[in-house]
């Protein structure tokens, strides 16, 4: 793995609570997350796999690993962006996700791009 700035991706995430698919009485809280990925290095690189760590408010952790994202392994040129939306379900109204993407540059260099922790929160309703 390398920390060389030629091999770098920027990852930003936006989240949303999905009330129509959630059931509070059954402790089922559904969230979507939209991920914005940009190749900020100067070498073309392909996202090969993902590793998510999902933690609910009780500390229960679930790990999700798999090839690509939403069935794709995007190849990004320097400065190119890719965006996708996916979802997850928690047993609590609050949680956190974090992880990394495993990436291979066109020259064969492999590196991981960290996905900083982000919150999943059900909005509170005031009466």
Curated annotation (Swiss-Prot):
Database matches in HAMAP family: ApaG (MF_00791)
Domain ApaG: 3-127
Pfam families reported for this sequence: DUF525
InterPro entries referenced in this protein's UniProt entry, alphabetically: ApaG_domain (IPR007474), ApaG_sf (IPR036767), Uncharacterised_ApaG (IPR023065)
Record organism: Methylobacillus flagellatus (strain ATCC 51484 / DSM 6875 / VKM B-1610 / KT)
Gene3D superfamilies cross-referenced by the UniProt entry: ApaG domain
Biological processes per GO annotation: error-free translesion synthesis
Name listed for the protein in its UniProt record: Protein ApaG
TM stretches of this protein: none
């Amino acid at each position: 793995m390398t920390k060389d700035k030629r091999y770098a991706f920027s990852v930003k995430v936006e989240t949303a609570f999905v009330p129509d698919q959630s059931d509070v009485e059954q402790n089922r809280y559904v969230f979507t997350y939209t991920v914005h990925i940009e190749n900020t290095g100067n070498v073309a690189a392909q996202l090969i796999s993902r590793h998510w760590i999902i933690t609910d408010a009780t500390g229960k952790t679930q790990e999700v690993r798999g090839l690509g994202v939403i069935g794709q392994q995007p190849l990004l040129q320097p400065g190119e962006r890719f965006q996708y939306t996916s979802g997850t379900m928690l047993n609590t109204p609050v949680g956190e996700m974090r992880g990394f993407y495993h990436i291979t540059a066109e020259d064969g260099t492999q590196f991981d791009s960290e996905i900083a922790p982000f919150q999943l929160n059900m909005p509170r309703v005031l009466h």
